[in-house]
Amino acid sequence: MNPRRLDAWYFIAWVLSLFAMALLPSSPVAAEPGQFIVSLVAEKKLNGLPPGPLYWRIENFPALDQAQSAAAASPTSLAAAVSGKVWLFTLGQKGGATPGGTKVAEVGPVPVFAAPEYLLRINHAGGPPGSKTPVHSHPGSESFYVLAGQVGQRTPHGVNRTEAGQSMVGHGPDMPMEVFSGGTTDLDQLVMFLLDATRPASVPAKFE
């Protein structure tokens, strides 16, 4: 091939490559929402439930050993250190208090149900805006207390949202649901469960 013609072809290819680069977006394409993370922090089994309408009482303690001592003295209390604070969670009647603790919230009334054995479970959960769980169900009820961000819960009954510093009581056993981070900042929340201990704590589900 003629050297001049070869040089011309190289020049045309170079111009076309510059044109193609100019068509590329100037900023990266937005990534998919991050992962919704769920961590187990405490659990305890019960043979039976306390009488009367039940609430989750949430309290802060100065030190973890104090909260653990209080939890050891109560069959329906659990202690955990989450998000830089020490927490005591107690399932019981409304209006109670634990010596040495500072009450943060009472969440309820919690839906109750019959079971051969019960499991109290506390999860720490959350994620960036747009993150969500798969559709699932539990053999019991769950309640939420939001530390930061906004939690959303989608069920066949609709969508409920709760902001930081507020609580939300979920539905009873076997309700299909999807939980998501619905705000503009990362979700950080505590999730309190009353479950049938003889069944899997969570199973896949679907919306009909």
Question: Residue locations for each model-derived region?
Answer:
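Jelly-roll (double-stranded beta-helix
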Residues: R5-S143, Q150-E208
